[in-house]
């Protein structure tokens, strides 16, 4: 399904589908890098370079967050960026929306530029540490850690979030 759709659909009974899509896109980028180093044929390089951009298929331009997408192309509804699990693995949309390690400039562009990117990134630390644990039916330890840290919706299990500031040369913000 991923190869055909360019994302793992939300409505096909595959858990953690958006997380999988983001991870597969990164994996494809890694394969592309290895294939390039091994001087593989251009057709093969293009396949993996193109699939590395599949993260864009689960980016919702309205919420500016990653979101589950159904097989028919519609985004999952209802949607709560605070819902842990479901379309994500031990995290939520606020956490996974930054999981584009291989194309940070592409993510910045999708969000509408550096100013909006920083505002969204700041929001992770500003929004209250609220959560929806209905997928798990209980508070898992990652949720508890997030609430105890009291740093908004930042969960330290997703360490790349503060490092995202460095893509904008905002090292001083990343250090706090």
Predicted regions: what is each one?
Residues 3-40, 44-55:
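Active-site cavity-forming subdomains of large catalytic enzyme subunits
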Residues 1-5, 166-173:
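Conserved small/polar residues in nucleotide/adenosyl-binding loops
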Residues 2, 24-26, 88, 96, ...:
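Aromatic side chains
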Residues 115-119, 169, 174:
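Alpha-helical multipass membrane-protein architecture
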Residues 32, 37-161:
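Catalytic cores of carbohydrate-active enzymes
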């Amino acid at each position: 399904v991923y190869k055909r759709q360019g994302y793992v659909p939300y409505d096909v009974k595959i858990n953690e589908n958006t997380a999988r899509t983001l991870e597969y896109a990164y994996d494809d980028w890694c394969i592309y890098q290895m294939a390039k180093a091994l001087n593989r044929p251009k057709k093969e390089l293009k396949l993996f370079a193109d699939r590395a951009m599949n993260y864009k298929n689960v980016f919702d331009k309205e919420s500016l967050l990653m979101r589950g997408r159904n097989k028919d192309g519609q985004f999952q509804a209802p949607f709560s960026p605070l819902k842990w699990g479901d379309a994500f693995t031990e995290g939520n949309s606020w956490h996974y929306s930054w999981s584009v390690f291989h194309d940070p400039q592409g993510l910045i562009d999708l969000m509408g530029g550096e100013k909006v990117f920083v505002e969204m990134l700041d929001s992770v630390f500003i929004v209250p540490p609220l959560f929806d644990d209905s997928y798990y039916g209980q508070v898992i330890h990652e949720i508890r850690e997030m609430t105890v840290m009291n740093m908004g919706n930042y969960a330290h299990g997703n360490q790349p979030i503060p490092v995202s500031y460095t893509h904008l040369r905002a090292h001083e913000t990343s250090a706090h």
